[in-house]
Regions:
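Structured, hydrophobic secondary-structure cores that serve as assembly/anchoring elements
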Residues: 1-62, 297-320, 324-474
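Structural signature of extracellular appendage/secretion-system components
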Residues: 1-87, 91-100, 105, 143, ...
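Extended, beta-strand-rich, solvent-exposed assembly scaffolds of outer structural proteins
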Residues: 33-41, 84-154, 203, 222
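A glycine-rich, acidic short-motif signal
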Residues: 41-57, 67-69, 163-169, 173-303
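Generic recognition of long tandem-repeat/solenoid scaffolds
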Residues: 78-82, 138-143, 336-340, 444-448
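Short, exposed beta-strand/loop patches in secreted or surface proteins that constitute
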Residues: 93-94, 129-134, 160-174
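Extended Gly/Ser/Thr-rich low-complexity repeat segments
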Residues: 95, 148-165, 462-464
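Generic alpha-helical secondary structure
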Residues: 111-115, 119, 213, 398, ...
Length: 474
């Protein structure tokens, strides 16, 4: 067969649009650019920000979005309380998520004037996830969307500090505090219905509460979901959570699902969790489309602001997160990078430790191999008759036998081996079984036991140093 085509590996982002936005809720929309997302979802909306974060890493990949209605609940608020009059002219640098907002301050400005300047500067940037109001020296930021997701939009002052040229004007103090916590989570059943049977290899989910994740767990499951024999759509869900070590461990322990990657980030991370989820989805898409078996480690999350030095997880803490099914990231030279994309799967049905689905690359490799097999069989034997081995049919007959299919699968395995997807051909050949079903004469049963290549993650060295070798050099 001449077929060498591959699936496009489309991505999907789920999130909120602004009230009154052009996009229709719970409908699948092709999203070519961040500009188009702002146009139809609304500037500052969750979806617009997620698309922007996604496109910073994957500018060319096929991307769809689904806008979901807001939760029934409360919108998160953050307060900035100004104290002290300015004794010099300067600038207040407020970071709302990844965006720096600069508010001018003039020598002699009082708290009310400074707060008003901050409010005006924030409201002048429509792409922000908050709107601002001020009164008596207090600036109140209110999330554009109701729900828990507003609690994971960081606000801080002077992210880069003195070394980065960011300091408060003399005489001015500003305290940043959490106001009203956002409450409520959206109902995702409409979004799942909108997905229908469209294939999405990479799904970015901004909602990390247990019920929301479990809705996607059901959609992805192996029995009746996207990974079932009946649907064969496959795909993987990426979500993110910002929190303390204990909060993230608790979150990871809520799940035991191989089709979900929950990435954990430090409390002081200066990027909203929804944008982190979108960025990690994009990074996986770019890497996995190119090679599903190659590890995503070191992948740059472009434009994402990490926690500052001294506020990042230690290696021991990162290992703890991984042990509880939470994917990790690290920072090198100020750049946030993927450390390991584990899934939340840790135990089998008996509660015994199981690393079969530890790494998301294993699942992506499985999807790649299964699609390859389907492509080979349907392209070459789409309208063939089935006969037993040894049948003496004439030349030109479109007939296939178990031995023919077995030979085809062995040839395909060699192709996968050359592509660096599988290994151990001889053992695979030994264990491969293709036989005609005893009850259904139109069916071939195949036991296909691939040995996937793995990822280099640990390089162990015993450094047995010597001050001087006593033997003469050879």
């Amino acid at each position: 067969a001449a077929n060498t085509a591959q699936d496009s590996g489309a991505s999907l982002l789920i999130g909120h649009a602004n009230n009154g936005a052009e996009i229709v809720a719970n409908s699948l929309v092709l999203m070519p650019s961040a500009d188009y997302a702002r146009q139809i979802c609304g500037a500052g909306s969750q979806l617009a920000r997620m698309v922007e974060a996604y496109r910073q890493t994957d500018p060319f990949g096929e991307l769809y979005v689904i806008a979901v209605p807001e939760a029934t609940g409360a919108a998160a608020t953050v307060t900035l309380t100004v104290t002290g009059a300015a004794t010099e002219t300067g600038t207040v640098n407020v970071y709302v998520g990844r965006t720096r907002v600069q508010a001018p301050v003039t020598n002699g400005d009082n708290v009310t004037t400074i707060a008003s300047s901050i409010k005006d500067a924030i409201n002048a940037v429509p792409a922000l996830p908050f709107t601002a109001s001020s009164s008596a020296g207090v600036v109140t930021l209110t999330a554009r969307h109701k729900g828990l997701c507003g609690n994971e939009i960081p606000v801080s002052l002077n992210y880069y500090g003195f070394g980065g040229g960011e300091v408060l004007p003399a005489g001015v103090q500003i305290a940043v505090a959490t106001g009203t916590a956002g409450t409520g989570a959206p109902v995702l059943t409409g979004a799942v219905a909108a997905m229908a049977d469209e294939p999405f290899d990479y799904i970015g989910l901004p909602f990390n509460d247990t019920a929301s994740v479990n809705t996607l767990v059901t959609e992805m499951n192996d029995t009746s979901g996207r990974w079932s024999y009946a649907r064969q759509l496959y795909g993987h869900v990426y979500t993110a959570k910002i929190g303390t070590l204990s909060e993230l461990v608790t979150a990871g322990d809520q799940f035991n699902q191989q089709h979900i990657t929950l990435a954990g980030y430090e409390k002081e991370t200066q990027t909203p969790a929804d944008e982190l989820a979108a960025s990690r989805t994009a990074r996986a898409a770019v890497f996995i489309r190119n090679d599903p078996a190659r590890p995503t480690q070191t992948g740059e999350l472009v434009g994402m602001l990490p926690a500052p030095k001294g506020k990042r997880f230690t290696m021991t803490e990162q290992q703890t997160l991984l042990s509880h099914g939470v994917a990790t990231a690290y920072v090198e030279s100020g750049v946030l990078r993927i450390q390991r994309d584990v899934t939340t799967y840790r135990k089998n049905a008996y509660g015994v430790a199981d690393n079969s689905y530890l790494d998301s690359e294993t699942l992506h490799t499985s999807a790649y191999v299964l699609r390859k097999l389907k492509s080979v069989i349907t392209s070459k034997y789409g309208r063939h008759k089935l006969a037993c081995d040894g049948t003496r049919f004439g030349p030109g007959q479109a007939i296939v036998t178990p031995a023919v299919i077995k030979g085809e699968l062995l040839a395909t395995y060699r192709q996968l081996e050359r592509a660096g997807i599988v290994e151990n051909y001889e053992l695979f050949k030994q264990y491969l079984v293709v036989e005609r079903d005893a009850s259904d004469p139109n069916r071939l049963n195949t036991l296909f036991p691939p040995d996937y290549v793995n990822q280099l993650r640990v390089f162990a060295v015993v450094n047995q140093f010597r001050l001087q070798y006593s033997e003469e050099s050879a």
